[in-house]
């Protein structure tokens, strides 16, 4: 297996970068030729892999935290809101970027947005609730899940979208039946708040989910049977995680700005690469190859690639 190598770019000049808000989430566009970044400064589109700024999409939502494209690539959802005031999700048409609808029934910032299908999406909020929405029903959510005692910060769907896994500041992972809205089980092995949750993309056997927490561990789970399979403790807190497309490795971006490449079977760090100068909040894997976008403090975005030359060095573009 070829090692990962790093190349990158700053979104602003070196003089202005200290004034830029952190990149909080990243997503590749459906055609995978661009990457979308969100932050307190809004929604920005960058060419991939050059990372040249191409476009800004206007939004009325403050403090954006999460971004997701619908499975058919026709819609873009972004979530955020003012802390302790409201949680908002805006849906835009894609690629035009025109506003389609807006959901604002959460009482605190939205931390995570995912799509169940092309018409329904799920949101997780600091208000401790998870809501299911339909694009044609703008006023109220069609399902609300309650059970977390603190902020819900990450969610993912397994089992053809019929089962939801959620996690957050109460240290727990919770498994929900989406048809009935009932809680199936709770898993409590993390000892500090959980930052991220990601489903392994390869479907061989039981679904596997990875979680990253402030206890500096990345844990691997089989939620359908309530089993924690294994874990690894890092020397820096992981802020975000992503599986490679083949499910063979997990990338973790950390508070020290480095990227750890983890073997989920041997639970070892196979590579440890420098990336962001500061906290690396955002991470997105390219859908067609072994490259990724990494975003973090002061508006930085870098790219990580699986190049044929192991000795290639990382340099800002």
Which residue ranges define each predicted feature?
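WD40/WD-repeat beta-propeller blade N-cap
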Residues: 16-23, 58-64, 103-110, 145-152, ...
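Beta-strand-rich domains and repeat architectures in extracellular enzymes and scaffolds
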Residues: 17-41
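Short loop/turn segments that connect beta-strands within beta-propeller blades
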Residues: 48-51, 94-97, 135-138, 178-181, ...
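Hydrophobic beta-strand positions that form the internal "hydrophobic ladder"
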Residues: 35, 76, 121-122, 164, ...
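Residue-level detector of Asp-centered blade-edge/turn motifs that repeat once per structural unit
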Residues: 30-31, 71-72, 116-118, 159-160, ...
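Short coil/turn segments within WD40 beta-propeller repeats
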Residues: 41-44, 82-90, 108-111, 127-131, ...
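A structural motif specific to WD40 beta-propellers
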Residues: 52-55, 98-101, 140-143, 182-185, ...
